Amino acid sequence: MVVQFGPMPPPPHAKKTLVLSYAGCGTCKKALRWLGDHDVEVEVRPIVESPPTAEELSAWVPRSGRPLRKWLNTSGLSYRALDKERLGAAKDEEILRWLTQDGKLVKRPVVVMGKHVLVGFDEKAYAEVFG
């Protein structure tokens, strides 16, 4: 039998969780409210002023389990302004460049906690990560 003395290890979300958010986004507000209600300490980064970098996306996309194209905010004005023919033919490199140049093109919020990256707000997924 192993007996542990001393302080309990911190919960999995003890480090600050990075949330890329847009103040006018209802989904972001819901996600931030949920995180607050579950005592998750967050660092909010405004996604429009500070969109994700290519390096961040290269690390986060595989951890999210979503293909890069699913990171596009298809309901926003920036997306609607894209040339649909060009969008259909776009390679990942071009989509990556768009996402780094226009934060409104990124589906939000983006929540980064350790090895977990969540895109959008899905209460069940948040509960699995943050308990």
For each predicted feature, which ranges?
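Local sequence-structure signature of Cys/Sec-based thiol-disulfide redox active-site neighborhoods
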Residues: P9-H38, V42-R45
